[in-house]
Amino acid sequence: MAEAKVLSGAGLRGQVAGQTALSTVGQAGAGLTYRGYDVRELAADAQFEEVAYLLLYGELPSKAELAAYSAKLSKLRDLPQALKEVLERIPADAHPMDVMSTGCSFLGNIEPEKDFSVQRDVTDRLLAAFPAIMCYWYRFSHDGKRIDCVTDEPSIGGHFLHLLHGKKPSELHEKVMNVSLILYAEHEFNASTFTARVCASTLSDLYSCITAAIGSLRGPLHGGANEAAMEMIERFSSAQEAIEGTLGMLERKDKIMGFGHAIYKDSDPRNEVIKGWSKKLADEVGDTTLFPVSEAIDKTMWEQKKLFPNADFYHASAYHFMGIPTKLFTPIFVCSRLTGWAAHVFEQRANNRIIRPSAEYIGVEQRKFVPIERR
């Protein structure tokens, strides 16, 4: 057996842990592409369903292929009665990410992936069902309403907003949700994606891989940054107060979520996109506080620490302007990143070897066992 190479760097920073044809992250200090397409171009001109098709099927769809794919997803939106009954038993104070993992896992019990030949069908089912899993639980546990899980909205983003608010979303809100889902769809070997690939390398089923990824995203160092950013932004009532508060947090060495990135060195290309849409939403509602506060924090972090906002920071205000409860921010991430997770599972399965690294032992030297009577 060849001697294992010791990898340096906490959290495997800077280490190449495998190959992928799905995305590039941080090339030349910035940039994000999905199968060669710049995410900024996709966010400007594509539908999320086109991007999902690109990631899952390998190429952008034709007009006919997109129509057929969207129609397929629309037909898969409803939830089985058994799953609805499970969701009704989950309390309102449950962690929404636990709701998503429970929903995914339970669906795998009643609609199992019988073999890998149906992996795309299973993914399409989850892609169609995840908005309803989130919203059915939320509306029942918080409002006492059993909602219809089927809408006539053509897009997944519009469908989610309709389920959440019980009415057709505005054209602007549907567009922003579409952009958001595209921006969060895929991001190379992040923690949750690598978790999914490790699970897939054991030849586990797709539901288990996605449930494992959701569990990884649940952690505050991976998912939840937009929720934490929203909670921080809401503390301040003016831009000046935000500047003073941010300086105080920096002086106390408090953790400020939504800034910097493990891979990007100069900027996060997703941020410039969602910031622009957040500004449009702010203008629509006549906001004079939330967006100026966000910009003040942004400016202060750059001036003091040369840290730029990542995709999560302005997503917080964008979601808030659309009336989305803060606790649902990360589950929306799940609805989007499912496409990337599943595509990585497909990729892992296509050229698989179980992921089993070695560890550098740093414990005590070998010693002789002492019977309990002599200890």
Q: PLM ranges: what are they?
A:
Residues M1-R375:
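Non-transmembrane, aqueous-exposed alpha-helical and coiled segments at domain scale
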